């Protein structure tokens, strides 16, 4: 397998940072708040709520959306406790939140922007969430927001020009069945490892809340808005190579370590793993739909998501030039964006078996 660059978001507070350009992800958390509350109310055993309650966010990035996610959970736990015991949770429960991401994540920005007046203690847990990062039975609820789509490696053969799996695109577009199969197999392996690790770390009866985006069954990545914009990124990098701004070899060897699985594929992987029961698989109505169809907003939003990863391979100036071209392509091909097929924004609730 070929190891990719570590995937992180652009840190800091600048106009290109994830901190400033992640309103789309935050909107899903806000839209899902009521369903998160319902899921915790229905599925969290009151016996788990002791005087110390621990929440863990895996793939927290540098904020601020992680704070929304964990606060949604804490609010729901307190509401359930008050309703079922009649006691004030502030008098009886201390909350701790564990923030996990790769060691090169911008934890400084994360901890400098912790919400004032928060009612929880906090700690950082650096490490890959594909592996164990905590002792057994360390927390009661885990959350992953837009992090349940990564693979740890590029599938073997994808970058080999002599292989039938050679993929000229930077992503898994879905149009080459062999490439899709290779990505799905790698995603399945990595997701199984992730679920195995969380099952060890979760308390018995604990919950995992997964929020993110997937494909509806039968829809190909490049038929969606996200896939189309990623195609624009690849085309822009090729344009820069043709102009001599970067090397064609760098473009040809640049592949993303993400796989937007179909809804049915996700369900099958979880069920075959056997460590969790799917308590809910909800379709969340996102207030911004897929993304706002504004070329500038699209370019800025995708730069926050992919910019650091692209910069690690090409350098920051090439990355910036590429996204300038992405905005141009989005404006020139706006009719194409209006014809894309919808993806799916989801909340998956898993209970540890």
UniProtKB/Swiss-Prot annotation:
Mg(2+) binds at residues 167, 252, 254. It is an enzyme of class 2 (transferase). Its cofactor is Mg(2+). Keywords: Magnesium, Metal-binding, Methyltransferase, S-adenosyl-L-methionine, Transferase. SUPFAM superfamilies: S-adenosyl-L-methionine-dependent methyltransferases. InterPro entries: MeTrfase_7 (IPR005299), MeTrfase_capping (IPR042086), SAM-dependent_MTases_sf (IPR029063). Its EC number is 2.1.1.-. Substrate binds at residues 18, 21-25, 146-150, 301, 306. Binds 1 Mg(2+) ion per subunit. Pfam families: Methyltransf_7. GO terms for molecular function: metal ion binding; methyltransferase activity. GO terms for biological process: methylation; response to herbivore. Induction: Induced in the presence of the herbivory P.xylostella larvae. It comes from the Eukaryota. S-adenosyl-L-methionine binds at residues 18, 59-60, 65, 99-102, 128-130, 145-147. Belongs to the methyltransferase superfamily. SABATH family. Homodimer. This is Paraxanthine methyltransferase 2.
């Amino acid at each position: 397998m070929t190891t990719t660059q570590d995937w992180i978001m652009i840190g800091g507070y600048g106009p290109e940072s994830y901190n400033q350009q992640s309103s789309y992800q935050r909107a899903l958390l806000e839209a899902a708040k009521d369903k998160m509350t319902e899921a915790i109310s229905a599925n969290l055993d009151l016996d788990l709520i002791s005087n110390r309650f621990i929440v863990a966010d895996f793939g927290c990035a540098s904020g601020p959306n992680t704070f929304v996610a964990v606060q949604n959970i804490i609010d729901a736990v307190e509401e359930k406790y008050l309703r079922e015991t009649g006691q004030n949770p502030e008098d009886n429960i201390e909350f701790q939140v564990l923030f996990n991401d790769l060691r090169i994540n911008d934890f400084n920005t994360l901890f400098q922007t912790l919400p004032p007046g928060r009612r929880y203690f906090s700690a950082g847990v650096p490490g890959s969430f594909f592996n164990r990062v905590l002792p057994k039975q360390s927390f009661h609820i885990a959350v992953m927001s837009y992090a349940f789509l990564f693979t740890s490696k590029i599938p073997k053969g994808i970058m080999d020009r002599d292989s039938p799996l050679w993929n000229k695109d930077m992503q898994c577009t879905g149009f080459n069945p062999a490439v899709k199969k290779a990505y799905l197999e790698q995603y399945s392996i990595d997701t199984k490892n992730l679920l195995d690790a969380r099952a060890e770390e979760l308390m018995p009866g604990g919950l995992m809340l997964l929020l993110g985006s997937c494909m509806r069954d039968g829809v190909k990545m490049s038929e969606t808005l996200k896939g189309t914009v990623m195609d624009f990124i690849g085309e822009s990098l090729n344009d820069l190579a043709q102009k001599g701004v970067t090397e064609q070899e760098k473009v040809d060897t640049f592949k993303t370590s993400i796989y937007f699985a179909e809804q049915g594929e996700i369900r099958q992987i979880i069920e075959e793993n056997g460590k969790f029961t799917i308590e809910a698989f909800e379709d969340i109505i996102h207030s911004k739909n897929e993304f706002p169809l504004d070329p500038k907003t699209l370019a800025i939003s995708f730069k926050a998501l992919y910019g650091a990863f692209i910069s690690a391979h090409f350098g920051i100036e090439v990355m910036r030039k590429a996204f300038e071209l992405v905005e141009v392509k989005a404006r020139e091909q706006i009719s194409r964006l209006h014809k894309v097929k919808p993806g799916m924004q989801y909340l998956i609730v898993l209970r540890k078996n």
